[in-house]
Amino acid sequence: MSVSVFNRCWSKVILETLVRQGVSHVCIAPGSRSTPLTLEAVRLQNAGSVTCYTHFDERGLGFFALGIAKATQSPVAIIVTSGTATANLYPAIIEARQTGVNLFVLTADRPPELWECGANQAILQQNMFGQYPVANVNLPKPKADYSAQWLISLLEQAAFQQKQQGGVVHINVPFSEPLYDATDEAVDSHSWLQPLQRWLIQTKPWMNVEAQQNEVLMHENWDHWRTKRGVVVVGQLPAEQAMGINSWASAMGWVLLTDIQSGVVPTTPYEDIWLANQTVREKLLQADIVIQFGARFISKRINQFLQAFKGEFWLVEQSGKALDPYHHSLTRFNAKAHHWLRAHPPLRQKPWLLEPLALSKFCATFIEQQVGGNLTEASFALRLPTLLPYNGVLFLGNSLLVRLVDALTQLPESYPVYTNRGASGIDGLLATAAGIGIGSNKPVVAVIGDTSTLYDLNSFALFKNVTQPTVIFVINNNGGAIFDMLPVDEQVKDQFYRLPHNGDFSQIAAMFDLKYAHPYTWADLNSVVKQAYSRRKATLIEIKTNPSDGSSLYKRLIEQISHAVIGA
């Protein structure tokens, strides 16, 4: 039996199984040992079953796949060769695990006889990602002793675990040489595949799993709790779940606190600012019940409120993951937000607390005065909605600016917002944004800090794949300005935290064949954004700001509002 032919048969069954589990995008890094998998992925692309993407940097490739999976809400497959190529996927796997994004990670491996004996590019790959995958599938070296039906069943069981929990399935696939001399005809006619002929011409999985009917029932004490003083807190949510939360909370007369990732229009904007007011915060803590939708809040003030609240606490979240870092004694609903709302009709009543609305109005005027008309980090955050395309999506990086956007920006209802807030790292942000562009097939606006951009420069190469207008705003405050918030000596901050680079990104844009602009005023910015939306490709727009302006304004707003005396 030809080893190369059977390697391909083995790979064919793996990839055909994944396609039947919803995979339609395959992200591939170049490598020799992964050739059987790559060639079968190419065959599937030629048949119209998948679209393949390539990238030379496995770390960026992992985040690119993550972005596609976020936008499509379908699993994405990744193929890499053996050795440290596999390890470079770890950051994306961690982020996927934290946020329940489904990826199938296929790592080609040397065969067992080459492990731990000094063989080239052979590392210990079995279970190498520890507990971060929802399932680790350590396949044996391809052998006809194992039936194709066994292989499919093993993979589908792992896929079932993924559907239940959300996250990564790691499939380690050792291959012996030779890898290259198999023909498609020899693979398709191999006797090992004969029991699968009927399955291969269909699109159904091997095992049919009936979908669970998760009907949301009204809580037995809802008629009691809906008469009480409540606070609705909304974190990261899929866009389709955001509709209706605002009107529901308003009808109840309850206070609504929203994260920028929620897609919910706030009734009392600038929560991250006005929650700094101690008087209002203390009154808010007198609520009888908090109902939280989603999780992973950016706002420090919202997190502080959740930590301090000791009353009745309900969490509505569909993933089933533990998402209460403050360990409340709570009632948990594993449900989508809009399904839960339908099962819990509101009781119309007047607002029980008026100070948040008064403070919010005060903040609106005060913030406008403080921000001014120049093009700065804060004015960019405040006026970001004016730069967004209709029917587009927004990706926010992890930097000072995401906090300014969360504090100052009011987005249209259900405008899709994507972030990497599972582990909140600065790695892979450009790659994720590129993947979201591919997965959504919509215009994309990405807002990323300069240090994050430097960290992921290779991923600019991925934007060659986009087919919709894509604007990458790089907010260049000359290093990690977010560290200005730390109570550390200024000299130590520069040397060990901020790390100023004193550069710009014009030559980087040229290297990756990206359109580039560096506007100095709002008029210039509006003009270059309009031009960018006329092109179905990526444009890098660099906005240079004074290093401490954004953090200084942010701290000033918090300080001023914390002592404000506002009459309801």
Swiss-Prot record:
It comes from Haemophilus influenzae (strain PittEE). GO terms for biological process: menaquinone biosynthetic process. Pathway: Quinol/quinone metabolism; 1,4-dihydroxy-2-naphthoate biosynthesis; 1,4-dihydroxy-2-naphthoate from chorismate: step 2/7; Quinol/quinone metabolism; menaquinone biosynthesis. Homodimer. The keyword Amino-acid biosynthesis does not apply. This is 2-succinyl-5-enolpyruvyl-6-hydroxy-3-cyclohexene-1-carboxylate synthase. GO terms for molecular function: 2-succinyl-5-enolpyruvyl-6-hydroxy-3-cyclohexene-1-carboxylic-acid synthase activity; magnesium ion binding; manganese ion binding; thiamine pyrophosphate binding. It comes from the Bacteria.
